[in-house]
Amino acid sequence: MKDSDSLLHVHPAYSLKQLTQYFLKLGALGFGGPIALVGYMHRDLVEERQWVSEAEYQEGLTLAQVAPGPLAAQLSFYLGYVHYGFLGSALVGLAFVLPSFLIVVALGWAYTLYGGLNWMQAVFYGVGAAVIGIIAISAYKLTRKTVGTSWLLWSIYLVNAATTIVTESERVELILGSGALVLLVKFPPKHWIKQNRLNSFIGLPLIPLFAAVPTATTSLLGQIALFFTQAGAFVFGSGLAIVPFLYGGVVKDFGWLNSQQFLDAVAVAMITPGPVVITTGFIGFLVAGFPGACVAAIAMFIPCYLLTVIPAPYFKKHGKNPKISTFVNGVTVAATGAIAGAVVVLGRQSLHDLPTFLIGLIALISSWKLGKKLPEPLIIVIAAIAGVIFWSK
């Protein structure tokens, strides 16, 4: 705790206003997904401005990787916390998320107003197919990065993928159970007692609290709040990890959107700056207008904020504990398997004729071979044009 307190009392080389303005700009112009966004933060804040030290940045990045939540948003929370505490974390996070939230709300309004028109349907006819290709290549890259050669991890991956395909939803208890299984195999319980380190799981005990939140309520906004609070606690490994979870709840359980509307929501997230999970604002708007968008976005980011700032003071001491990284590794592999399963589930809904199959295939190849030269937003725009062309024939 002393390390964290001393950190907060060091006079920073920047004001909270300057840091907030930086993240407001990044949230408005930061395209490229979570990896690109955290790269921009390192370039701008560590290398160029030197507001944050390399050690502080790496600590924040590590915490963002091991705790549930969207990577870029959590790193922004931590960097706001470093010198300005809880208030700094909240203001910086709000500044980072606000621009993309306003964009998706505007798109939600346009979608609601014009979604029934032929040209809008034609646009999303192509966009939905491209989304499948992009998610497929993302799942492939995540699989190569996270699973490795371990038979245990491959088993977990395949079980979660198959479960998602069969149930058409992500099973949270299976995700958490996967992390627990890897932990038990690598570190049997007698080893914990021997080492006396059961108290090392800083932050992880909070996760079941979010999982246990009931979703039964008579209020629509209450249902939205409870569901997206749960969603915010289970974004492990990548922002795309939330896709199968959201599909299971929004489409299968609550029936708020149909499959095509959900795919359109994912597409909107890919063409806007900021974190991918801001699609929750778009979904919330379609379900319950502007109040729904606000409730969904706030509920989504509250767990991410809490699971960043609460463990932060203790992270210097416990952050490198191998048990934490082992548990998170198992959960991440399970989430990656769920993403792979979601590709199949969503593909059934979107790739229903030759043109959509070709658009999806071209998007996949483009993301794979031309990822840096042809960013995802541009692929989506090209797919939209292709959709208009094919739709009219």
Swiss-Prot record:
Signals that turn on the gene: By sulfur deprivation.
InterPro entries documented for this protein: Chr_Tranpt_l_chain, Chromate_transpt
Protein name (database record): Probable chromate transport protein
Function: May function in the active transport of chromate into the cell under sulfur-deficient conditions.
Compartment list: Cell membrane
Single GO BP term: response to chromate
Gene, per the UniProt record: srpC
Entries under Pfam families matching the protein: Chromate_transp
Organism: Synechococcus elongatus (strain ATCC 33912 / PCC 7942 / FACHB-805) (Anacystis nidulans R2)
Family named by the database record: Belongs to the chromate ion transporter (CHR) (TC 2.A.51) family.
Cysteine pairings via disulfide bonds: none
GO terms, molecular function: chromate transmembrane transporter activity
Membrane-related topology note: Multi-pass membrane protein
